[in-house]
Regions:
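Terminal-region recognition feature
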Residues: 11-12, 66, 70, 99
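Helix-hairpin-helix/helix-loop-helix acidic hairpins
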Residues: 35-82
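Amphipathic alpha-helical interaction segments
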Residues: 23-26, 70, 87-90
Length: 147
């Protein structure tokens, strides 16, 4: 374990689990490697399901999906760790890729990712990818190209 990792284990503001710290560092490296294939945003958005969910009660909301299982498997093939299908599904919810807000909720549809017809707003997903890629390029310029 290097000095940086020991310092992280003593940081009370983060999870102090050595395996998870190593996984976070590893996943950052895997994210950088994905830039050669279009970047993490492009990779993630490739798993957007063809239809939205329509939950009317909390029990209708799954913990994982076919797409989150695929995403998890492919992320692991790319070297990512601690990215199971439940974690991938939570990511998909967090970025609006799937809308698990209950029908009738004031939050339903606020991401703009889904059209009222229930099909994806692919134009918006492309805008998200372009924004993510431009921010990645800016970070490279700011910190020097990743090696």
């Amino acid at each position: 374990m290097c000095i940086r990792d020991r310092r992280l284990l003593g940081d009370a503001s983060i999870i102090r689990n050595e395996t998870k710290i190593r996984a976070a560092i590893n996943n950052a490296k895997a994210t950088i490697a994905l830039r050669e294939e279009g970047g993490l945003a492009e990779f993630i958005w490739a798993y957007q399901p063809p239809e939205n969910l329509y939950p009317t009660v909390m029990e209708d909301i799954p913990k994982k999906s076919y797409e989150s299982k695929l995403m998890s498997r492919e992320l692991k093939k790319k070297g990512f760790r601690f990215v199971g299908p439940v974690t991938c599904f939570a990511l998909m919810e967090a970025i609006g890729m799937i809308d698990t807000h209950l029908i009738g909720s004031h939050r339903r549809g606020t991401s703009g990712v889904w059209l009222e017809s229930g099909v994806p707003n692919y134009g918006l997903a492309q805008e998200y990818n372009a924004l993510a890629n431009s921010q990645t390029a800016g970070a490279d310029e700011l910190h020097g190209a990743a090696s």
